[in-house]
Amino acid sequence: MAHNYRGRIAPTPTGYLHLGHARTFWFAMERARSEEGILIYREEDLDYNRCRKAYSQAAIEDLSWFGCVWQKGPDKSEMKQSYRQSERMPLFLKAWKDLKEQGLIYPCEKSRKDIRKASENIQNIDLEPIYPEAWRPSHDVADKIDSPEGYN
């Protein structure tokens, strides 16, 4: 019986991998295999200042040497989509523009702890956690965010 399981490994090429990476990726590979699914290698290379091509190549070589196997990734010749985040920037920008047009982009001044606590207070367990409406700014504040880099 085939499953639709899709696991992923997502190293950031800002340095060489260590045994902790290998262990984590091995478990991800075994999980995908046990679920009769696939493992996807997706590179998190959006830190333009620290990511290096040499680290990217070394990660693929080292994980392959270690015995990790993935079915989709930047090193697969049948690649029909990009598995490097930096190559997906046009998709991210389109999604950002779509959310902006819907009025769903706004600054957040709450801490992760505040948001986690609000999510824990949801009464209906069937609902996804939703950012509390009372915390959302007025539309004039949201309209000032003109680019993905506009608010940090």
Briefly describe each language-model feature range.
Residues 107-152:
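Active-site cores that bind ATP or allylic diphosphates and position pyrophosphate for catalysis
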Residues 2-123:
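N-terminal Rossmann-like or analogous alpha/beta NTP/dinucleotide-binding catalytic cores
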